[in-house]
Amino acid sequence: MEQGLRTYLVVTGAYWAFTLTDGAIHMLVVLHFHNLGFSPLEIAFLFLFYEVFGIITNGVGGWIASHIGLNRTMITGGFLQVVALGALTVDPSWLSVAYVMTAMAMSGIAKDLNKMSAKSSVKLVVPKGENADTRLFKWVAILTGSKNTLKGAGFFLGGLLLYVIGFRWAMGGMAAMLFVVYLYAWWALPMGMGTSKTKAKFKQIFSKTREINI
């Protein structure tokens, strides 16, 4: 198997596994904390940091990847999701709103690191040749087109796991599965993928036009 295809399959497999857990953790948190008697407003607050830190990560993720490589940002995102899932396996008495918001913040950072890394790496691994553009289009379509389907499957998976094995075992099981997936990805992905020869300064990620920045 050619190196580019092998790398693409590793990236896609890791991205799919992550997306499943991303959908599942949302459904598990909503249903579990609803069952615990949390109000709709409290449940909404559980996801506040997930969105806020995801937006921040989306803004600086490319700059980070240019310095350390897409392979490292993807692996970091995967293992950060493992930590977030593991953090939610603690004793129920620990699961305050602030605690869960912190865990979901880690998940939000992980999600955008993983998404950015997966999508950006595809262009780098497509073999050069006559049909390179066609193959790039197909590979990107497979990777990105699967997102909503897999996230929906993750919602179903989360509800099923909550019903069958409960909240803590569901979180622990997904953490273990994702750990194995990203451990393999860490071994399989080429080092330094996507690093830039010229390191941009942090301030260069902002536009010179003030109106765009604000």
Give the residues covered by each predicted segment.
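Cytoplasmic helix-loop-helix junction between adjacent transmembrane helices
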Residues: 103-147
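Helix-to-loop junctions at the C-terminal end of transmembrane segments
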Residues: 57-70, 162
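Juxtamembrane intracellular "pre-TM" segments in multi-pass secondary transporters
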Residues: 1-5, 186-214
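Symmetry-related core transmembrane helices of the 12-TM Major Facilitator Superfamily/SLC fold
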Residues: 169-187
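C-terminal ends and interior cores of transmembrane alpha-helices
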Residues: 79-94
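Hydrophobic core of transmembrane alpha-helices in multi-pass small-molecule transporters
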Residues: 16, 84, 95-114
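Helix-loop boundary and gating motifs at the non-cytosolic
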Residues: 2-53
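Residue-level signature of mid-helix packing/kink "hotspots" within the transmembrane helices
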Residues: 51-59, 151-152
